[in-house]
């Protein structure tokens, strides 16, 4: 599956969860077009409510439903980098991971730009 097709499929899934997803960015080998047969899909995820902590996001029922829908729709493994809360968001933006996301990232979903 090519990057464009992957992004469209991911967007369809993400758009079903506007109550929990604020922004989703594809990064890593798929965003660079360097994926191999065993490549996982790397996603950076910000919640729709930026005040919600990372721990609360990960334990929410809706987030678990979102994860299951990803795994049900793809044969690949996922690496979901989910960050919430002001402190965690500020911290991740000072890391090499963030530099990679900025450099290679492909926006999959942004709740603020979705049409209702």
Segments from the language model and where they lie:
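Catalytic core of pol beta-like nucleotidyltransferases
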Residues: 1-23, 32-37, 47-116
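Glycine-rich beta-strand-to-loop/alpha-helix junction loops that act as flexible
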Residues: 27-29
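Short, well-ordered beta-strand segments
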Residues: 42-44
């Amino acid at each position: 599956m090519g990057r464009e097709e992957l992004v469209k499929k991911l967007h369809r899934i993400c758009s079903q969860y506007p109550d929990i997803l604020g922004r989703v960015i594809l990064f890593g080998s798929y965003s660079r077009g360097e994926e191999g047969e065993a490549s996982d899909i790397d996603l950076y995820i910000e919640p729709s409510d930026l005040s919600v902590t990372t721990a609360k996001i990960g334990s929410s029922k809706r987030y678990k439903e979102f994860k299951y829908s990803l795994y049900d729709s793809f044969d690949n493994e996922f690496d979901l980098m989910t960050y919430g809360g002001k402190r965690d968001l500020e911290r991740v933006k000072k890391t090499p991971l963030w530099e990679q996301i900025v450099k290679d990232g492909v926006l999959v979903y942004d709740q603020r730009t979705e049409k209702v």
